[in-house]
């Protein structure tokens, strides 16, 4: 196993521990807590894949970080901060919406690009709105935390979420996953509308009618993919 992979995991574990302490002391906001829960799942998945104990890795990570801080100067820190662009966090969903349990009568799911797409194929003739929480860098979606599909009465009927044990995903991965989800829901005559944030940061355009900015050709292609999988 590559030593850099182990070191990276150990440091990530310790930094997660520090962030958890902040959360326990009520020193962080809702987006911070969102990322904390997501990263906890990711660390558990990585630990299982690498065969490493999280507690031991956290202690080793602490030693590595402490050694680095001993040689770190304020000037180096200022330079690092100035040269690194800071991502923004976009929230369509509240904490309640993103953490609510939901169930499917006719479950269908697909893995694509490190993302899990889930949808209830029993849903028909509904108006559905897509909402998502994600980070943005350089005015483009960087990392998806969660995307969920809601009916007008607030019921959750579909979801896209990162798979903790798999490597990260790209903007194209997210767009493809959304296309699969839309195709599957529209196959049952549902009407889909994406939030303005999804339209702006995933595709960089806005549809005047509030619909998902997918060309008809791409919608039909995604629908055929879902039909073949179902």
Curated annotation (Swiss-Prot):
Residues 223-230 are annotated as: PABPN1-binding. The keyword Transport does not apply. Upon interferon induction, ISGylated via host HERC5; this results in the impairment of NS1 interaction with RNA targets due to its inability to form homodimers and to interact with host EIF2AK2/PKR. One of its GO terms (molecular function) is RNA binding. Residues 1-73 are annotated as: RNA-binding and homodimerization. It is found in: Host nucleus; Host cytoplasm. Residues 180-215 are annotated as: CPSF4-binding. Pfam families: Flu_NS1. The keyword Ubl conjugation applies. GO terms for biological process: symbiont-mediated suppression of host cytoplasmic pattern recognition receptor signaling pathway via inhibition of RIG-I activity; symbiont-mediated suppression of host gene expression; symbiont-mediated suppression of host mRNA processing; symbiont-mediated suppression of host PKR/eIFalpha signaling; symbiont-mediated suppression of host type I interferon-mediated signaling pathway. Keywords: Eukaryotic host gene expression shutoff by virus, Host cytoplasm, Host gene expression shutoff by virus, Host mRNA suppression by virus, Host nucleus, Host-virus interaction, Inhibition of host innate immune response by virus, Inhibition of host interferon signaling pathway by virus, Inhibition of host PKR by virus, Inhibition of host pre-mRNA processing by virus, Inhibition of host RIG-I by virus, Inhibition of host RLR pathway by virus, Interferon antiviral system evasion, RNA-binding, Ubl conjugation, Viral immunoevasion. A motif (Nuclear export signal) lies at residues 137-146. Transmembrane segments: none annotated. The dsRNA-binding region is required for suppression of RNA silencing. HAMAP family: INFV_NS1 (MF_04066). Homodimer. Interacts with host TRIM25 (via coiled coil); this interaction specifically inhibits TRIM25 multimerization and TRIM25-mediated RIGI CARD ubiquitination. Interacts with human EIF2AK2/PKR, CPSF4, IVNS1ABP and PABPN1. Belongs to the influenza A viruses NS1 family. This is Non-structural protein 1. The gene is NS.
């Amino acid at each position: 196993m590559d030593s850099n992979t182990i070191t990276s995991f150990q440091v990530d574990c310790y930094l997660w521990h520090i962030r958890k302490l902040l959360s326990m002391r009520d020193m962080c906001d809702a987006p911070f807590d969102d990322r904390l829960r997501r990263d906890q799942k990711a660390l558990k998945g990585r630990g299982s894949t690498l065969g490493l104990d999280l507690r031991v890795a956290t202690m080793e990570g602490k030693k590595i970080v402490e050694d680095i801080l001993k040689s770190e100067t304020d000037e180096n820190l200022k330079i690092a901060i100035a040269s690194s662009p800071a991502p923004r966090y976009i929230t369509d969903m509240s904490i309640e919406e993103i953490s609510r349990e939901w169930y499917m009568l006719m479950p269908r799911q697909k893995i694509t690009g490190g993302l899990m797409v889930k949808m209830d194929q029993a849903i028909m003739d509904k108006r559905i709105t897509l909402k998502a929480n994600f980070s943005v860098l350089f005015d483009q979606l960087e990392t998806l935390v969660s995307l969920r599909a809601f009916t007008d009465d607030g019921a959750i009927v579909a979801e896209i979420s990162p798979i903790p044990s798999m490597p990260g995903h790209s903007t194209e991965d997210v767009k493809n996953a959304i296309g699969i989800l839309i195709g599957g829901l529209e196959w049952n005559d549902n009407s889909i509308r994406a939030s303005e944030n999804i339209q702006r940061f995933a595709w960089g355009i806005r549809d005047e009618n509030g619909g998902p900015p997918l060309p008809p050709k791409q919608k039909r292609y995604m629908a055929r993919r879902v039909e073949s999988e179902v």
